[in-house]
Design a protein with these regions (language model features):
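A short alpha-helical cap/connector motif
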Residues: 1-127, 134-149
């Protein structure tokens, strides 16, 4: 998300911050060069979750699980996330982060190519968050639209 500096400052001023676990995970990911969502996107997602109160969320692109856990933390307790990751080096780290956060029961973690997995999913999702290979979004779109409630 590209945002002008004044708008970024305003958006970030409205956010009370994250939990210590998420702050630690964010610092760790950034120090290891793992791309995670920026502060203003974190604020936007928290606002969207508060307004929409989704029960079923689909995330395409898990990385180390930062945004997955952010959505777990700031969603309704009965919410469930299905998240997809293809990069083998990040899968164990994401699993470990889900375990450390105590959110495993809220998360279905699917490993593999999102293009194929999306075709196999059924049911409707209240919210779909895409944070994967940007060049593939156009190919994911038909399946994402089919799955979006």
């Amino acid at each position: 998300m590209i945002v002008e500096e004044r708008m970024r400052t305003f958006i970030n001023s409205l956010d009370a911050g994250n939990t210590p676990f998420l702050d630690e995970l964010e610092c760790s990911a950034l120090s290891e060069g793992v791309p995670i969502i920026r502060k203003e996107m974190q604020s936007f997602i928290k606002t969207l979750l508060a307004l929409k109160k989704p029960q079923r969320i689909l995330e395409v692109g898990t990385a180390v699980g930062f945004s997955t856990l952010l959505m777990c933390e700031y969603s309704q307790p009965e919410m469930h996330i299905t998240t997809i990751e293809n990069y083998e080096k990040r899968i164990p780290k994401a699993r470990e982060n889900f375990r450390r956060a105590g959110c495993e029961s809220q998360i279905t973690f699917l490993e593999g190519d999102a293009g194929q997995i999306l075709k196999e999913l059924s049911g409707a999702y209240d919210l779909i968050f895409m944070d994967a290979a940007k060049g593939q979004y156009i190919h994911f779109l038909p399946e994402v639209l089919r799955l979006l409630k």
